[in-house]
From Swiss-Prot:
The keyword Cell inner membrane does not apply. Transmembrane segments: none annotated. One of its GO terms (cellular component) is cytosol. This is Probable transcriptional regulatory protein IL0164.
Length: 238
């Protein structure tokens, strides 16, 4: 799991390097999270994790505060999540997560990205079964057994725990995100998460043929340019 996770982080670093795009994506996600679960991070663990992630990605405090204030104001856009799946160059599998106020527009925009990169958008569930939908927490700790014990005491279902050079990475089903985070912060009050998120991790990878690489990069670039796109997951290796 760790390798796929690291590939994903490397992909983010390469493709989501425009600050304004990063701010916009976090702003929209924080707005939706605060609107759904409340604007108090102490009572909304998903929001707390999201704010911590945003700060680590150097999103300014005013961007975070504005999104929460907007959510608590009651008015504003009505964003809903949308997920699209398909096959890219070399038959790699791609999942695109969006937050949209116009699903028809967003579907058309995403489909256009696939079409113009010799790729094919598929039906819901066409590739998601080949990914694990995971909650992932990474942090510095010198005792793997203590982490496992904390998870067991809280009755959290853990998929995997990796320990390497003092870095512990806990993988759990996405539905266990809140319980796992609460268990970790309760057991280790000074915990500083290096990763705290929910992702789709591929169960197998697909090598991109050299001739297909330009089209794969075109697909990623076009999707990243869409305002409604929040996350892109794939199983490509290149």
């Amino acid at each position: 799991m760790g390798r796929a996770y690291q590939n994903r982080k490397d992909s983010i670093a390469k493709t989501a390097n425009a600050k304004s795009k990063v701010y916009s994506r976090y702003g929209r996600e924080i707005y939706v999270c605060a609107k759904q679960g409340g604007g108090d991070p102490d009572g909304n663990l998903a929001l707390r994790g999201l704010i911590d992630r945003a700060k680590k990605d150097q999103v300014p405090a005013h961007v975070i505060e504005k999104a929460i204030d907007k959510a608590q104001g009651g008015a504003g856009e009505d964003f809903s999540p949308a997920r699209y799946e398909g096959y890219g160059p070399s038959n790699c599998m791609v999942i695109v997560e969006c937050l949209t106020d116009n699903p028809n527009r967003t579907f058309g925009d995403v489909r256009n990205c696939f079409t113009k990169s010799k790729s094919k958008i598929g039906a819901q569930g066409s590739v998601a079964h080949s990914f694990d939908h995971c909650a992932i927490f990474a942090f510095r700790h010198d005792n793997e057994d203590e982490v496992l014990e904390a998870m067991m005491e809280a009755d959290v279902d853990v998929t995997d725990v990796e320990f390497e050079d003092g870095l512990v990475t806990v993988f759990a089903p996405n539905t266990e995100y809140a319980a796992a985070r609460q268990a970790l912060t309760h057991a280790f009050p000074d915990i500083d998460f290096e990763a705290d998120e929910i992702q789709f991790l591929p169960q197998v990878t697909t090598s991109i043929a050299e001739d297909d690489l330009p089209m794969f990069e075109r697909l990623m670039d076009m999707l990243n340019d869409l305002d409604d796109v929040q996350n892109i997951y794939h199983n490509a290796e290149h």
